[in-house]
């Protein structure tokens, strides 16, 4: 049986940790002038993928 392929787009966006998969928050790429400093500061923090999405991410990262 051939090796399973890792989804490269998913590999670049998510990192496996002991508690699940770490991800970056959205809404911090452009149109930042109208967003408050507080909002942008909170968006800089990493967060975990929702529990319901973990199986799909894990399937795309077979060696994570």
UniProtKB/Swiss-Prot annotation:
SUPFAM superfamilies, per database record: L35p-like (SSF143034)
Membrane-crossing residue ranges in chain numbering: none
Superkingdom as given in the UniProt entry: Bacteria
Single Gene Ontology MF annotation: structural constituent of ribosome
Gene3D superfamilies: 4.10.410.60
Gene Ontology biological process: translation
UniProt keyword list: Ribonucleoprotein, Ribosomal protein
Disulphide bridges: none
Listed GO CC annotations: cytosolic large ribosomal subunit
Keyword Cytoplasm: no
The family this protein is said to belong to: Belongs to the bacterial ribosomal protein bL35 family.
HAMAP family: Ribosomal_bL35
Designated name of the protein: Large ribosomal subunit protein bL35
Species assigned in the record: Shewanella oneidensis (strain ATCC 700550 / JCM 31522 / CIP 106686 / LMG 19005 / NCIMB 14063 / MR-1)
């Amino acid at each position: 049986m051939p090796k399973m392929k890792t989804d490269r787009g998913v590999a670049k966006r998510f990192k496996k940790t002991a508690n699940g998969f770490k991800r970056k928050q959205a809404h911090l790429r452009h149109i930042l002038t109208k967003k408050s400093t507080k909002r942008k500061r909170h968006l800089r923090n990493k967060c975990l993928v929702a529990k319901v999405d973990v199986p799909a991410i894990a399937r795309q990262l077979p060696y994570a």
